[in-house]
Amino acid sequence: MDGTFDAGFREPTISKANRWGREMVVALKLGWPLIFTNLSQAALTATDVIFIGRLGADTLASALLATSFYHTLMIFSMGLVSAVMPMIAIALGKNRHSVRDVRRTVRQGFWSAIMIVIPLWVVLWHCEEIFLFLGQRPDIAARSTDFMHTLQWALLPYLFYIVLRSFFAAMEKPMWTLLVAALAIGFNALAGWTLIFGHFGFAPMGLHGAGMATTASSTMMFLGLAFITLRHPRFRRYHLFGRFWRPDWPRLIELWRIGLPMALTFVFETSIFYAAVVMMGRIGPTAMAAHAVAIQIASLSFMVPLGFGQVATVRVGRAYGRGDPKAIAYAGWSAYALGVGFMALMGILMVLMPRVFIGIFLNLNDPQNLPVMELAVTFLALAALFQIVDGAQAVAAGMLRGLRDTRIPMLLALFGYWGVGLPLGAVLAFQFGMGGVGIWLGLAAGLGMVAVLMTIRWRRHLAHVSAVAAA
């Protein structure tokens, strides 16, 4: 958070109970479309995993290797352009009709997407050398690379979609993104089923078909939101695509100043999960396939606190923009409570009914899947242990982004994930012979450390803005 907080806002006195209740209602109203939008995004990947899983364990392992690497780079670039969200929220907090400010930010979000995606395309095209360097089997590395050569073209339209999604979220109108994402699920499922297995006259394309379906779906999502911004009277007045070619260097620099630490924070978190995939690959195909199933389930539940983290970014950002310290606290803690509460419930369900979740991704009646299923049950029980802290760190990070605090949280994430989580997981897995279980315990420890550190930093910010308001 910078030192420009203006505590000039004074709101009529409202009881604490009413304030908490009102903020909870607002968080839920804004949050559920964001949550289901996140789930829709996860469902696109989950649909591909379900289809590809029917092609065999080795093919699933190849897809996991490729998508894990792709998503690591995608998350980095997505984190960069997601700086659009707090910047717009703060601008609207200062002035509800900041048309020019909003337009400048969105345009530079598009510019940033183009700037970052070109070098990433080069890296993705040559990923086979990276996979072999990391010790993956040559046959799996080759299949993963073939998959990547179709999947990578989804990146640019997806980043454009993220820019517009951030715009709609900051405007507190996320229903449009939910509508587009929901339509994309059906489109991706139909396209994947058609191209992967060969229907409606198409030859079976396997992994290539999955990549083509994802690229087409990402393009559809961007075009859908772009159409709404161009046609809807509420958004058309921003002229987001007008004079697109004009540079705006001050705004571009500001976006990168906020967004680059966000991008690195996202990468530190997601890359530790990619490192876990690499370590699982060294243990064996069974561990890797079981990890693929368990991590997919955990990722789906994570979409809920991620949504409440986005709510926190918008609500905290707007309160920060208008200089209201009490609203900052209520907005942040309300989203925090909702995110952590949901993850606690999901952790209980993962322990009580793991086979229900696993059966979505594996045929439980196939004897060949029994070793994978048994190991996935164990991994899912361990995932339940870190559900609460995972939710806490996700929402706390969103709260801090609403204050434009991204650099120190980046360092906290680096320490927690790579200073604690990964080394501990590697030692437990390979030095103490715990295998995949040790890797999952390390992940839990890293998430817990980040959650504690970010929550402490948030509390310090609250103390600071309260002191400024009282001065």
Curated annotation (Swiss-Prot):
Keywords of this entry: Antiport, Cell inner membrane, Cell membrane, Ion transport, Membrane, Transmembrane, Transmembrane helix, Transport
A GO CC term attached to the entry: plasma membrane
Subcellular location: Cell inner membrane
Keyword Membrane attached: yes
GO biological process: monoatomic ion transport
Keyword Transmembrane among record annotations: yes
Single GO MF annotation: xenobiotic transmembrane transporter activity
Parts of the chain that traverse the membrane: 30-52, 67-89, 110-132, 147-169, 176-198, 208-230, 255-277, 287-309, 330-352, 372-389, 410-432, 436-458
Membrane topology category: Multi-pass membrane protein
Chief location bin: membrane
Job of this protein: Multidrug efflux pump.
Family statement drawn from the similarity comment of this UniProt entry: Belongs to the multi antimicrobial extrusion (MATE) (TC 2.A.66.1) family.
Name this polypeptide is given: Probable multidrug resistance protein NorM
Source organism of this protein record: Brucella suis biovar 1 (strain 1330)
Recorded name of the encoding gene: norM
